[in-house]
A protein has these predicted regions:
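Structural motif
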Residues: 166-169
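Short, positively charged patches
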Residues: 1-149, 153
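Glycine-rich phosphate-binding loops that contact phosphosugars or nucleotide phosphates
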Residues: 156-159, 163
Length: 171
């Protein structure tokens, strides 16, 4: 993760920092983030990084958003200390973050998904592998024995065909 205000603001706006989801403000969804980024770009503020340090009334005035939305954005952007602790734990475990504006972000995701591409990715390992042709398999972790055999057969075929297998939530 590059240490820029733009990246930091993106991570603050999108991250769920507590396990029990009991936060003062709910992080932005992907769709909300894209809309909000466009609002910011169309304003005099220009970029998400320039929002850091703004108070609620400045957010309202500069972006033309309702007080409730300004409060939510303000609350999300002011979790810097908490986020620093969370990021430190991630980095210790070899987990990193890349955001859509960074050079390392997989271009294929943007090409294929457009504004449905996740603005932020958590990853471990070599992110450059995501530039290769591949197949993502997620959620295959809690299956019966027959399902596991089926998935193993599928995985074997994927690998023999020369595709990179990207997993998430699988065993």
């Amino acid at each position: 993760m590059r240490q820029t205000d733009e990246v930091f603001a993106t991570v603050l706006l999108l991250s769920q920092l507590t396990i029990n989801r009991n936060e003062l403000a709910r992080p932005l969804t992907t769709a909300e983030w894209y809309r909000f980024r466009e609002t910011v770009r169309a304003s005099r503020v220009g970029s998400l990084g320039n929002l850091l340090g703004m108070d609620i009334s400045a957010l309202q005035q500069e972006l033309g958003i309702p007080e409730q939305d300004a409060f939510r954005i303000f609350s999300l952007l002011n979790r810097t200390v908490h986020l620093s602790y969370v990021l430190e734990k991630f980095f210790e475990k070899g987990i990193d973050i890349v955001t859509i504006g960074e050079e390392e972000y997989p271009k294929r995701l943007v090409e294929r998904l457009g504004e449905k591409a996740p603005p932020m990715l958590y990853y471990a390992g070599d992110l450059k592998l995501c530039q290769e042709k591949g197949i993502l398999m997620a959620g295959a972790g809690n299956m019966k024995e027959a399902g596991e055999r089926c998935v193993q057969t599928l995985v074997d075929k994927i690998i023999r065909a020369g595709y990179l297998l990207i997993t998430g939530g699988t065993r």
